[in-house]
């Protein structure tokens, strides 16, 4: 599970690095050139302007609608991720048995544990990395959305609810973003593994800190996206993907645990 935490940290670092590598002060419009601007940033900017005009100039509502459209676009991938999470939960009893069998910390035993674990995954057709693919796809979308927000001059200093869209909200919105991130991850938690519990608390804190310094419109994207994921998880798999009863209901190796 350390690998998943490392990947999450790496992706966030890449996001921040790439954010600094592009000129976020250059306005985005139909004349913008380059693959990044033409096919990633400008379409999102155009959508925000289109929906803002439809909502009497409200870019806050436009951001919410665009966020929901993005979530609907990647919904098939997220459903696949949820199914993969469910399958991983069903394998937890066998994985725990392997960890107990190969509990020694020497290199040879740990290699044997890894081999047996991979064989278990192959036996049941489970891809342990399947849950990472939606994250990889979301990162460029999030970066493009950040650029669209920063470079769409029409947004300006518009107020939405209690915050200004192109400025950070120092307290309330970041807290909401952190809480919804926690709830979303809690519902998708597969196991009581201590390392996963660390990730459960670290990611919301990271989102909270980022939301304190990034434009409120991006934090709004996180909040709406998290709420969508919470509802999606609830209606597709129930209130807790990691509930112990899941393992009892899913067939593993042709037998019910």
Swiss-Prot record:
Signal peptide interval: 1-20
Claim: Lipoprotein is one of the keywords in the record: yes
One annotated Gene Ontology cellular component of this protein: plasma membrane
Coiled-coil region: none
Keywords (A to Z) from UniProt: Cell membrane, Chaperone, Lipoprotein, Membrane, Palmitate, Protein transport, Signal, Transmembrane, Transmembrane helix, Transport
GO molecular function: membrane insertase activity
UniProt-listed InterPro entries: YidC/ALB3/OXA1/COX18, YidC/Oxa/ALB_C, YidC/YidC1/YidC2_Firmicutes, YidC_ALB_C
Bilayer-crossing regions: 35-55, 59-79, 129-149, 160-180, 205-225
Membrane topology: Multi-pass membrane protein
Top-level taxon of the source organism: Bacteria
Main location: membrane
GO biological process, one term: protein insertion into membrane
Localization annotation: Cell membrane
Lipid-anchored residues (S-diacylglycerol cysteine): 21
Lipid attachment site numbers (N-palmitoyl cysteine): 21
Task of the protein: Required for the insertion and/or proper folding and/or complex formation of integral membrane proteins into the membrane. Involved in integration of membrane proteins that insert both dependently and independently of the Sec translocase complex, as well as at least some lipoproteins.
Family indicated by similarity: Belongs to the OXA1/ALB3/YidC family. Type 2 subfamily.
Protein name as it appears in the record: Membrane protein insertase YidC 1
Protein's organism: Halalkalibacterium halodurans (strain ATCC BAA-125 / DSM 18197 / FERM 7344 / JCM 9153 / C-125)
Lineage: Bacteria, Bacillati, Bacillota, Bacilli, Bacillales
Encoding gene (name): yidC1
């Amino acid at each position: 599970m350390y690998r998943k935490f490392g990947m999450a940290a790496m992706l966030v670092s890449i996001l921040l690095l790439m954010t600094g590598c592009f000129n976020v002060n250059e306005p985005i419009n139909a004349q913008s050139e380059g693959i990044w601007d033409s096919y990633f940033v400008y379409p999102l900017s155009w959508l925000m302007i289109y929906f803002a005009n439809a909502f009497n100039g409200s870019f806050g509502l436009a951001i919410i609608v665009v966020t929901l459209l993005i979530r609907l676009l990647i919904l098939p991938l997220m459903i696949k991720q949820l199914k993969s999470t469910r399958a991983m939960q069903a394998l937890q009893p066998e994985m725990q048995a392997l960890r107990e069998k190969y509990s020694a910390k020497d290199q040879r035993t740990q290699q044997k544990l890894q081999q047996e674990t991979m064989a278990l995954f192959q036996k049941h057709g489970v891809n342990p990395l399947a849950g990472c693919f939606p994250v990889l796809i979301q990162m460029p979308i999030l970066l493009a959305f950040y650029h669209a927000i920063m470079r769409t001059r029409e947004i300006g200093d518009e107020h939405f609810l209690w915050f200004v869209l192109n400025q950070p909200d120092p307290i309330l919105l970041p807290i909401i973003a952190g809480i919804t991130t926690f709830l979303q991850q809690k519902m998708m938690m597969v196991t009581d593994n201590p390392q996963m519990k660390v990730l459960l608390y670290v990611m919301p804190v990271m989102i909270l800190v980022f939301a304190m310094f990034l434009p409120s419109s991006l934090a709004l994207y996180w909040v709406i996206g998290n709420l969508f994921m919470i509802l999606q998880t609830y209606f597709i798999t129930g209130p807790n993907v990691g509930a112990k009863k899941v393992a009892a209901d899913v067939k593993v190796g042709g037998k019910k645990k």
